């Protein structure tokens, strides 16, 4: 939390009231101040019967007025907080994370939704922070030092290597601890912020971290969601229980139906039916086929040598669910 004790709503009021009514309206609507989202130049122009370019001119005139020495002195404590917030996170923060968390950092009691737009305005007015537009590899970012961009690229490259080698997601704390050894001068907050900046890395619904393209991270259908919940629970489940777990996880508003789950999993090579309606993962060592077929495979792998009844049952239970 900030130590400035400044009242962000009071600063917002003082800044905006110095503008003409139309300029106030343009700034408020363009930045979404007090609203859930910002408006386009076109929609604002339609209100006043003016062109998009004229709206842009009014916006720029308003921003120029807000950058006067008197106004900047009013918001300097907020600028200091903003720069400290970014600095504590390695000098770089993803835009949507910054807009979500900065207001709470200043004032935990403030309405984050209504003040998101004001945070965006502060970013535009502060000459000490820069914006990096989103691209194929990174989200839109705000940074205080250019070296932070290079540090983020270096760390993200290492994270991607770790995941490509492991071919499996990890809990974020494990990854951060591993990266702390590779980058000892980066704080844990900086490492987390750099990871968040990458489009190639994401969290799944259970908080595991992995490559965005993996179905375990961003499941795209019932089959992927089923795979994720069964793997997370670590045991074979009936298709009705799998449907229940998918719905409890709240992946989306769409309800998973038991019969749909059954129909999808019976065709999916990652799953094997190991009992009446029970599905397990092939990667756990279970085998497809009837009990007779599984027994035949066991004898084949043991080159036909005699096995005691106890050993046979033990090997069978590793391949089939009782």
What are these regions (language model features)?
Residues 1-322:
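C-terminal non-catalytic scaffold/interaction domains in large multidomain proteins
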């Amino acid at each position: 939390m900030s130590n400035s004790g400044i009242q962000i709503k009071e600063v917002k009021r003082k800044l905006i009231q110095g503008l003409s009514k139309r300029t106030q309206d343009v700034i408020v609507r363009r930045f979404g101040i007090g609203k859930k989202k910002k408006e386009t130049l076109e929609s604002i122009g339609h209100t006043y019967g003016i062109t998009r370019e004229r709206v842009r001119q009014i916006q720029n005139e308003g921003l120029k007025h807000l950058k006067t020495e008197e106004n900047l002195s009013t918001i300097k404590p907020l600028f200091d907080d903003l720069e400290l917030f970014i600095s504590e996170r390695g000098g770089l923060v993803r835009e949507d994370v910054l807009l979500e968390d900065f207001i709470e950092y200043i004032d935990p009691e403030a309405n984050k939704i209504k003040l998101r737009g004001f945070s965006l305005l502060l970013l535009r007015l502060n000459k000490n922070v820069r914006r990096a537009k989103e691209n194929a590899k990174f989200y839109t970012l705000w940074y205080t030092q250019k070296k932070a961009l290079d540090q983020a690229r270096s760390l993200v490259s290492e994270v991607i290597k770790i995941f490509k080698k492991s071919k499996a997601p990890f809990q974020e704390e494990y990854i951060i601890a591993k990266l702390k050894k590779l980058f000892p001068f980066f704080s844990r907050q900086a490492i987390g912020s750099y990871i968040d900046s990458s489009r190639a890395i994401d969290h799944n619904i259970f908080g595991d971290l992995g490559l965005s393209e993996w179905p375990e991270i961003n499941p795209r259908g019932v089959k992927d969601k089923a795979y994720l919940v069964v793997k997370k629970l670590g045991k074979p489940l009936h298709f009705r229980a799998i449907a229940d777990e998918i719905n409890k996880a709240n992946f989306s508003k769409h309800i998973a139906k038991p019969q749909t789950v059954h129909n999808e999993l019976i065709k999916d090579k990652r799953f094997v039916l190991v009992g009446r309606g029970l599905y397990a993962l092939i990667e756990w060592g279970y085998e497809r086929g009837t009990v007779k077929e599984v027994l035949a495979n066991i004898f084949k792998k043991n080159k036909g040598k005699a096995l005691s009844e106890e050993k046979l049952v033990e090997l069978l239970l590793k391949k089939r669910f009782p």
